[in-house]
């Protein structure tokens, strides 16, 4: 439903910090995002201005690190829900205007590189500009890595346990053909009719 993503035309999102000690390529790219955010935004000012958005009880334990790092002067990586993300078009315009040279240079890479940025740059910018409504995206969405949790994923789809699920595949899924057959059956169970774009 549309209200899951927007309220009064403003994106619903969670503003909460997470640790990023990783050495993976993804972790490095997230750190690149935060460098730009810290160049543009003052953490103390943002968290003071939007106190009720950053310290909202709806986030539950997902906000623990945000409370703990309140005295810390810089932004760190925000939680990155692995699901569909609402954006405002103006956010893309603003970020591109501010960091367009870096983004253009990055877009020349044929493959991900340690100097890249991710879409989380735009999301974090949007949150720092106060263009969001507090919403705990973890309360009604779930990401299932199919390599570990294919049975749980299939059950969640069939029973419609969440408003939104992300099914993350990879090349190491055991019994892939059987898992895919069961997953298709779960979707056919809840969506027996073809959608208009399939007709």
Locations of the language-model features?
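ER/Golgi luminal nucleotide-sugar-dependent glycosyltransferases, focusing on the catalytic module
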Residues: 2-199
């Amino acid at each position: 439903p549309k209200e899951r993503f927007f309220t009064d035309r403003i994106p619903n999102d969670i503003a909460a910090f997470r640790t990023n000690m990783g050495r993976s390529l993804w972790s490095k790219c997230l750190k690149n995002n935060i460098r730009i955010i810290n160049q543009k935004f003052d953490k103390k000012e943002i968290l003071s201005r939007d106190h009720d958005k950053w310290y909202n009880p709806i986030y539950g334990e997902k906000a623990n690190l945000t409370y703990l790092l309140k005295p810390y002067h810089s932004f760190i990586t925000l939680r990155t829900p692995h699901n569909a993300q609402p954006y405002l078009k103006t956010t893309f315009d603003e970020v591109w205007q501010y960091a367009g040279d870096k983004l253009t240079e990055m877009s020349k890479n044929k493959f991900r590189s340690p100097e890249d940025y991710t879409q989380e740059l735009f999301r974090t910018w949007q949150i720092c500009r106060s263009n969001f409504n507090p919403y705990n995206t973890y309360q009604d969405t779930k990401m299932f890595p199919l390599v570990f949790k294919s049975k749980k994923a299939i059950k969640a789809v069939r029973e419609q346990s969440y408003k939104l699920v992300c099914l993350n595949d990879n090349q190491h899924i055991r019994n892939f053909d059987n898992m895919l057959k069961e997953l298709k059956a779960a979707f056919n169970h809840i969506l027996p009719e073809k959608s208009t774009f399939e007709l």
